[in-house]
């Protein structure tokens, strides 16, 4: 595990953390019960198997 050699200032720490940005999930179309929905790719199998119900 990486260990810092020197202490990082509060200013540098906050500037570094401020660069992180959340990205929107890539939505893909999936048809469930005759209704086409746009859902995140990793949830498509759950919708197809019926583990998640579409909220319309």
Swiss-Prot record:
A GO cellular component annotation in the UniProt record: large ribosomal subunit
Its source organism is: Streptomyces coelicolor (strain ATCC BAA-471 / A3(2) / M145)
**Signal peptide extent:** none
- Keyword Ribosomal protein assigned: yes
Name the chain's protein. Large ribosomal subunit protein bL32B
Write out the ranges of the annotated region (Disordered): 1-22
Quote the InterPro entries the UniProt record gives. Answer: Ribosomal_bL32, Ribosomal_zn-bd
**Any GO molecular function:** structural constituent of ribosome
């Amino acid at each position: 595990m990486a260990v810092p050699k020197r202490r990082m200032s509060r200013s540098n720490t906050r500037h570094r953390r401020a660069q992180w940005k959340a990205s929107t999930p890539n939505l893909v179309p999936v048809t469930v019960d005759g209704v086409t929905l746009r859902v995140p790719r990793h949830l498509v199998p759950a919708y197809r198997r019926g583990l998640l119900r579409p909220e319309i």
